[in-house]
């Protein structure tokens, strides 16, 4: 099956985000096993949030591909790099890191609007993150992306998900109040099935609501890739 055709590439270039249906369905079982192993044995980079209202937690951990065999198999044996190169229009793709995000049933934690690039020690125009659903997710609980925001040439101030600034003395622009002005933006979101992937540019503004499903987990494996023009950048203050 051809998951990436010319229209998919055009949509990604224009909007900075595109849904790729069924792209990683053959890897579901392996990635789910890897997520279970990670939750049982998280890394020192694990960052979880427990809501004050007593609802279920939001688990996060990243850069575990080299110690979770199932993740390592996915990175090296799937067509992840091939798909990334096509979307980025890059001759090659370089794996940057993995990121696991699990919102347990009914978790009230909201993922705030942000761009990924300001958090990273990498620069360049060619980038893609595959937000791979390991469970069915309704449009109301899915990732949301602001179409075209990757073309604004603005990198907004990165904040921790608790609202604190990530870097000291950062004078970059705050993320605009999108939720109060949703009609002013073209917001992309989808009803997605397990095995689907949302591919988005590191510069794309995106966020996600609480897990509105009180009976199902919202497990996501994200894989971040960079292209030919990637260079290291030292973002002071972290």
Report residues per predicted region:
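Histidine-centered catalytic micro-motifs
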Residues: 110-118, 145, 205-208, 223, ...
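Double-stranded beta-helix
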Residues: 139-205
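Feature marks short, surface-exposed loop/turn motifs that line or immediately flank catalytic pockets
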Residues: 27, 104, 138, 152, ...
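Active-site region of the double-stranded beta-helix
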Residues: 90-91, 117, 133-143, 148-150
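Short, conserved beta-strand element in jelly-roll/cupin
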Residues: 121-138, 224-227
């Amino acid at each position: 099956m051809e998951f990436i055709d010319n229209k998919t590439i055009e949509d990604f270039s224009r909007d900075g985000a595109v849904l790729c249906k069924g792209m990683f369905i053959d890897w579901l079982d392996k990635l789910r096993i890897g997520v279970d192993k990670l939750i049982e044995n998280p890394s020192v980079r694990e960052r979880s949030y427990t809501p004050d209202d007593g609802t279920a937690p939001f688990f996060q951990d990243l850069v575990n591909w080299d110690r979770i065999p199932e993740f390592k198999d996915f990175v090296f044996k799937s067509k992840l790099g091939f798909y990334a190169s096509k979307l980025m229009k890059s001759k090659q793709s370089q794996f940057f890191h993995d990121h696991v995000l699990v919102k347990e049933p009914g978790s009230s934690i909201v993922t705030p609007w942000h761009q990924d690039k300001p958090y990273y020690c990498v620069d360049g125009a060619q980038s893609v993150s595959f937000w791979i659903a390991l469970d069915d997710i309704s449009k109301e609980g899915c990732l949301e992306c602001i179409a075209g925001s990757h073309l604004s040439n603005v990198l907004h101030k990165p904040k921790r998900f608790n609202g604190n600034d990530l870097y000291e003395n950062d004078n970059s622009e705050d993320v605009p109040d999108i939720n109060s002005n949703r009609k002013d933006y073209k917001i992309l979101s989808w009803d997605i099935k397990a095995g689907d992937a949302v591919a988005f540019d590191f510069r794309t503004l995106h966020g996600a609501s609480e897990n509105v499903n009180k009976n199902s987990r919202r497990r996501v494996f994200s894989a971040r890739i960079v292209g030919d023009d990637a260079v290291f950048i030292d973002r002071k203050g972290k």
